[in-house]
Amino acid sequence: MEFPSSPPPSYETVMAQVPSILAPLVPPRYKGATEGRNSIRYSQLPPLFDTTKLYLIDNKSSDIQALNYQNDHSNFLTTVVQNANYTPMEASTQSIQLDERSRWGGDFRSILHMNMPNVTEYMFSNSFKAYLPATADASGKVLTYEWYTLTIPEGNYSEVMLLDLLNNAVVENYLAHGRQHNVKEEDIGLKFDTRNFYLGFDPETELVMPGFYTNEAFHPDIILSPGCAVDFTHSRLNNFLGIRKRLPYQEGFIIKWEDLQGGNIPALLDLEIYNPDTPGDNITPLLQDSKARSYHVGEDPSAGSTFTSYRSWFLAYNYGPVDGIKSKTVLVAPDITCGVEQIYWSLPDMAVDPVTFTSSHNPSSYPVVGTELLPLLPRSFYNGSSVYSQLLQESTAQTHVFNRFPENAILKRPPAPTIISISENVPALSNHGTLPLKNNIPGVQRVTITDARRRVCPYVYKSLGVVVPRVLSSKTF
C-alpha cells in the first residue's frame, strides 16, 4: 500500500475538479457534522464531541449486588456509562466507541485511601524466626538449639509498644519451651533493646564504671547469647529495627552471634564491693543480679575477662572491626511501617495492553498502567519525657508484663526513645499521566490494585479513578 507524499487536496480544489451538475464526493475527512476524529459514540446515540469523564468508583450502590458481591475495594467492577436509567446488567451490554480514525489517550488520576496497620501477616511484619536454646542439663548448661517462629498480634503499634511486643514474644517462647527443659532465664537467648551499653566504659578497668547502663534510648538493637541467631529472611521487622542488609538483593538475612564480633557487652562495676575512698582497689565486675541470674562475665575467651558473653548488634556495628557485621549490614533510620512498598493500578478493559502482555483474567498478571507508593507513612515526634511516661505506665496501665526481669541490667525493659514514631494512612492523590485507550470501551470496567507481589490488597478503604479521554494522534499518519 502506497501513502501519498503530500496532504490531501483542499476542499476548493476538489470542488473545482468536479462539474457542478454532479454531486461531489467529499472525503470523510471533511465531514464536520459528526465532529470528525474527536467523536465519541455511545450506543443508540449519534457520534458527537463529548467531554464526559470516565469515573471508576469502587462503591456504586447499583454495582455492589450485581457485580461486586464477591469483590473488594482493590479488585472490583464498575459501570462507566453515566446513565441512571441503566441497570448494571444493561450497562454491561453498552459500550463507548472512540473514533477509529484516531489514537486515543486518557489522563488518569486516582485517589487512594487505605486503613492498613503496620503489623500484619499480609505484609510479613508480624513474625520472625529465632535460633534459641531448647534444652539444658540439670546444671543449666545449654545442650541443644532450635529454630522457633515468634509471632506478635496484628495491630497498629507505636515504636515503644512494638519493641515491648517483640521482647514479650521471646519471653513467651521461653516459657513455653526453654523453661520446660531446664534452660535458665539468663540463657533466654534473644533480647531487643535501645541502649548504648558502651557509655561509661573505662578503657583501663574495662568496666562500665558508673555501675549501671545508661537508661537512654539511641537505636533499636539485637542482643544475642552464644549460639543464637535471628532470621529476617521472610520478615520486614528488620526495617522497624533500622537494620538492613548492605546488599539487599541477596537472598537470606540471618544475624548470628558469631557475626557480632567486637560487640560483647562490657560488665558493670560491682558497687557493693567497690569503695570510693580507695578508688584503685576492689574493682571487680558484677557477676550476677539480685536474683542470682548470671551475667556470663568472662565466658567468651575472645572478648576478655571483663566482658559478658552477650553480644549486641549496635556495639558490633559501631565499635567492632570494619570487616565484621558492618560490612554485611547497615544502620538506617527505623521505619515504623516496616518497609511498605509500592502498589500497581491495572485497567485491563480500558487501556491498550503493552505488546509484552497478554490478556488474562488473573489479577496477578494484569498489565500495569500506573504505580505509586503504598500510602502508609511514618510520623515522628519528640517526647523528652518518654522514659518518665514509661515508668508511669507501669503503675497505672499495669505494664509489668513487659518488664519480666527488672533486676537484670541487660534483660530489663528497654527505655522508650525520645523520638517516637507512629504510622498513618494518608489519602494519596496521584496523576499517572496519559494512558493509551482502546477504541471500544465496554460499559463495565475491571479495576485492580495489587501490591508489590501482585496480590489484591484487602486494606484498601477507598479507591477512585478519573480518566479524561482525548485524541493523541491520527491513525492515518
Curated annotation (Swiss-Prot):
UniProt induction comment: Expressed in the late phase of the viral replicative cycle.
Chief location bin: virion
Subcellular location: Virion; Host nucleus
Highest taxon above the source species: Viruses
Gene3D superfamilies cross-referenced by the UniProt entry: adenovirus 2 penton base, domain 2, Penton protein, domain 1
Keyword Cytoplasm: no
Gene Ontology MF: a single term: structural molecule activity
Sorted UniProt keywords: Capsid protein, Host nucleus, Host-virus interaction, Late protein, T=25 icosahedral capsid protein, Viral attachment to host cell, Viral penetration into host cytoplasm, Virion, Virus endocytosis by host, Virus entry into host cell
Gene Ontology cellular-component annotations: host cell nucleus; T=25 icosahedral viral capsid
Gene Ontology biological process terms in this record: endocytosis involved in viral entry into host cell; virion attachment to host cell
InterPro entries: Adeno_Penton_B
Key word ATP-binding present: no
Family membership: Belongs to the adenoviridae penton family.
Additional remarks: All late proteins expressed from the major late promoter are produced by alternative splicing and alternative polyadenylation of the same gene giving rise to non-overlapping ORFs. A leader sequence is present in the N-terminus of all these mRNAs and is recognized by the viral shutoff protein to provide expression although conventional translation via ribosome scanning from the cap has been shut off in the host cell.
Function summary: Major capsid protein that self-associates to form penton base pentamers, each in the shape of a pentagon, situated at the 12 vertices of the pseudo T=25 capsid. Involved in virus secondary attachment to host cell after initial attachment by the fiber protein, and in endocytosis of virions. As the virus enters the host cell, penton proteins are shed concomitant with virion acidification in the endosome.
Known partners and oligomeric status: Interacts with the fiber protein (via N-terminal tail region). Interacts with the capsid vertex protein; this interaction binds the penton base to neighboring peripentonal hexons.
Protein name: Penton protein
Organism of derivation: Canine adenovirus serotype 1 (strain RI261) (CAdV-1)
Primary gene name: L2
